[in-house]
Amino acid sequence: VFPDRTPHPSLLEAKRAQQPFTLTAEICDWSISLTVTSEHLFRATDNERLNWRLGSLSDAHLEGSQVLQLPPEGSQTIVIDADSNLLAGGDQEILLDVWITTEQATHALSAGHEIARSQHVLALADTTRERETRPAEISHQGEQLLVAADEVSWHMDAATGFITDWVIDGRALLDAPVADCFVRAPLDNDICSSEVDNPSPEAWLAKWQVAGLFDLEHRCTGVEVKGATVTSQHEYLNDAGVAIRSVWSHTFDAEGGVDIAIEVSVDPEMPPLPRVGMRLLLSDKPEAVSWLGRGPHENYHDRKLSADLGAWSCDRQAMQTPYIFPSDNGLRCNVRQAVIGSVCIERIDDDFAFAVSDFGVESLMRAQHTFECMEQSALHVHVDGYHMGVGGDDSWTPSVRPEYLLNAETYRWGCRLSVAHDDRT
């Protein structure tokens, strides 16, 4: 727990991993078989209620509950009848959420306390449907490329190849260009057993510093306009030469949105990257953030057992985790859509991860204590196609499991940026 006794995200992970019930579900002839198994060795259930909800990320279609009566290490299967069209999926995932709560208060637990929870994805959403849009018109104004669509306008700098301005109803949304981001504020596990005067050469931080990852020099090598698509090519250089290349394809539509497809190529001599994503600096700081994805609390790709898929919303401050030693925090994974004030971010093909911060990477890296974190005037939003795992299975060592390392030579990802409307979620 934190000093104020609020739960640490890892405590929620531990609770889910060590809960005393196992819950499994499968579809059988358009019905759902839900099996609950008790891991209590000597105790029968006498104060537990089984609850379930069947629906999409944002809507419940069927709900139910019943008293749970199991002997020690016993199992019980219930059958949930569901509409065949619902289980066939469609535009949205179909999920079964199951949780077990206390019936009556005990000396240790209040009535309704959640003892166990599990989520089961029964049908995947169809993501192959193409969006029907009209292409936008792109004009040239010196070194600037201008896209105007209804009340929305975009500006791209032909010299840097990045979007520099995004204006809605005369209000500028960006405080800096939308650009690649490959770094994160180092975690304890990234620093591992390093000492102030004796850094460990095996630490991820040391390897990133040797590779010059935090000091890469950006160079735009070309910008091409073809119809409603602007393609820009970028190089990031360290002392040894070109470390990373990226190609951004921006396709603007007449509704004021842009689909961004990004391909990143990494020199094979580079260490695994912390992230492959983009950074947006937003001028406005909304009070709340909402998203469709894993939540409600912070989760990383190797730390998301307790983070369920759903439609979540919370205060901007709650999107950030105040670790005693300032570091990267607040990531949410497997996101389909995020709404941050006037900005809507949507997946195109694959899910993304995102984080919202009042501080930013540089401020977090400079600070040694939370009170030293300097809040920035702009809101830092990271949208990641890929993000390295946290690791730390054996305490503070560079022990990220191989499947959560970003050591490929090529990455492809993308997202859509558009104006957020009340009916988005």
Residue ranges and their predicted role:
Residues 83-91, 120-425:
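Beta-strand/loop-rich accessory regions of lumenal/periplasmic or secreted enzymes
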Residues 90-102:
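Short, aromatic- and glycine-rich surface loops/edge beta-strands on solvent-exposed regions
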Residues 62-64, 113-118:
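Extracellular and select intracellular beta-sandwich modules with Ser/Thr-enriched
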Residues 14, 36, 98, 151, ...:
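Conserved, mostly hydrophobic/aromatic
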Residues 1-73, 86, 352-380, 390:
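Substrate-binding clefts and catalytic carboxylate motifs of secreted carbohydrate-active enzymes
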Residues 106-115, 394:
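Beta-sandwich strand segments
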